[in-house]
């Protein structure tokens, strides 16, 4: 066979392969009623949640898989609370046969979001209201802003929130990482057990209650009114400034540093 014939055959094979892959792809879309949203999706590569104008009381969900038949175990429910879950709990091993699955969700501005993730899913969240997340595994969650935070991390998951304006609670068991860019919150409760890290880049906090057990590290580059700080083990707590009451306790080789006005 000539070189030209080989090239033509390769081109035909490539085009037919693309067509075959496209034919195998699957897409599902749902519009649900709901005042809040709960998301619990196993074995998904990416979930993006964004606010959209004109969606009062509605949630629009679209899921795409590179392989046909992979979305049949998705469960969509509407009502007072909208939810999307996946019945599957064991993920296929990594490799060429593993399907790529992504989910896009549009919600009303300010909607409360509750996320549960037990794997390595990447969550991208826009400006929402209340944001609760329970992350077990090695996933990522980034959010533009939230008005109220409750984050629970067990494992090595990472959470990054651009801005917060309400109370926050963060609990880390393991080597997880949590960061807020800028904050103006009335209260912040932190509990780190293990080697987890919590960082606040800038802002103001009314009441800070922070405890580290293990080798974790807290770096709070915000102005705090009242703070209660404690370490057990080799952990480290640093607070840029405390203007009011400061209470601290330490057991082990850890350090507590707090600037005073």
Regions found by a protein language model. Name each.
Residues 21-136, 140-154, 160-169, 179-189, ...:
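Acidic (Asp/Glu) and glycine-rich low-complexity loops/linkers
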Residues 9-20:
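Bacterial N-terminal signal peptides
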Residues 161-163, 168-261:
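Short, surface-exposed interaction patches in beta-rich subdomains
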Residues 1-10:
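Bacterial N-terminal signal peptides that target proteins for export
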